[in-house]
């Protein structure tokens, strides 16, 4: 690794905007972005994927490798990524720093506590929870209805036992007993707010708008009513600054914020993306999970808020994932199976069609695994060419930037100035926005709203939230809301079970299927493989 000062020097960053965290990590003052406003923006490349298998398809690895490969062919590039969540790192998913020869460094530190941003978000979130209950205890001036408190508590850990709890037990000195729950930090609205804020003023305004409860008159109670947004912003004072690290080949990487893509908008901070676009010719950013989740939200929501739009999209696919969506069993996924591959290719086709609806030039990055056969690779390449889409076999895991030159060249040939196309208009009613997404992206035949969802729609209309964008919270395991439906399901009924308003973040969340905001650990979590020796060397994390 290079000292972080050398990476900063590549970007022209002076000491007065750089806050080092040891030798290899630094934060960049978010106010530095203001000084770059007259610079021309570089190209923005959005990396997304087909519907992933449980192991993931290498989207982060591809993003890192592509950025390094662009630099290799003479194009100044920065990669922007989300911060890993500690819960999944210790649980099933593992770390989120790439793999092989295409990683961001120092991987262990990034995957664990990094610069403390997750802690800051959790602290701000839990401060609000504590103040809310304290207000109820000390007279309840706002007349908060304790049966209609929406704000939960949070921690950055997978712990299913905290999904439903009772607080305030032990007598009146401990407050009023009521049901509560914990959510994982990446699911906190504070995380979404931080990722969307462009400066401290914006951050405080968004925090103040967060809805925490209803009062006994059925009126909304916000953070601003509790007058706690200033203290929350104090706890986030450093977390608003993007984190600068490097890839395995010394390419600059900005890693900042970590909202999940299945329950939030699923991409790194707007500050980091805009800063990278000012400092490079090509910014490579990724959106979580498949294109039905992260990419749609990036375009319909994040791009609108940030005032930018991708110049091209990279659709990461693997032979493994396509065979899985064609019916192959995970136990035999590495065996050649052209029939399953043919059937599963329909999943790639749907994601490609969806991306083209946004007027985006697309490059398919076929992330090669050592078990892929030549026949399987040739089939995917041939089918992509039939669809008129550029395709490049990527070997950045094994070879680093050398293995992504073909992909980098394809991307530079594909990029263009794109006229933004959004699937819905902001003044469309929320139910219409959901129907458009369900039919156009998820390929449903019809949409059904539960009674709970219908009541939520009435609340949304009554309080003037009908013109907010929609974030659909659903499974990442299927294009549909049903994780058992692999491949390219269509014509089914898309069921909306509930809706809620994230007024600070500025969107309405539509819940479909079984969505948990607090994950649980598997039978054998990754934590069982982790250790540290007497010299402080960590094993089993990255």
Curated annotation (Swiss-Prot):
<dbReference type="Pfam" id="PF01268">
    <property type="entry name" value="FTHFS"/>
</dbReference>
<keyword id="KW-0547">Nucleotide-binding</keyword>
<dbReference type="InterPro" id="IPR000559">
    <property type="entry name" value="Formate_THF_ligase"/>
</dbReference>
<comment type="pathway">
    <text>One-carbon metabolism; tetrahydrofolate interconversion.</text>
</comment>
<dbReference type="InterPro" id="IPR020628">
    <property type="entry name" value="Formate_THF_ligase_CS"/>
</dbReference>
<keyword id="KW-0436">Ligase</keyword>
<dbReference type="GO" id="GO:0005524">
    <property type="term" value="F:ATP binding"/>
</dbReference>
<keyword id="KW-0067">ATP-binding</keyword>
<dbReference type="GO" id="GO:0035999">
    <property type="term" value="P:tetrahydrofolate interconversion"/>
</dbReference>
<dbReference type="GO" id="GO:0004329">
    <property type="term" value="F:formate-tetrahydrofolate ligase activity"/>
</dbReference>
<comment type="similarity">
    <text>Belongs to the formate--tetrahydrofolate ligase family.</text>
</comment>
<dbReference type="InterPro" id="IPR027417">
    <property type="entry name" value="P-loop_NTPase"/>
</dbReference>
<protein>
    <recommendedName>
        <fullName>Formate--tetrahydrofolate ligase</fullName>
        <ecNumber>6.3.4.3</ecNumber>
    </recommendedName>
</protein>
<feature type="binding site">
    <location>
        <begin position="53"/>
        <end position="60"/>
    </location>
    <ligand>
        <name>ATP</name>
    </ligand>
</feature>
<keyword id="KW-0554">One-carbon metabolism</keyword>
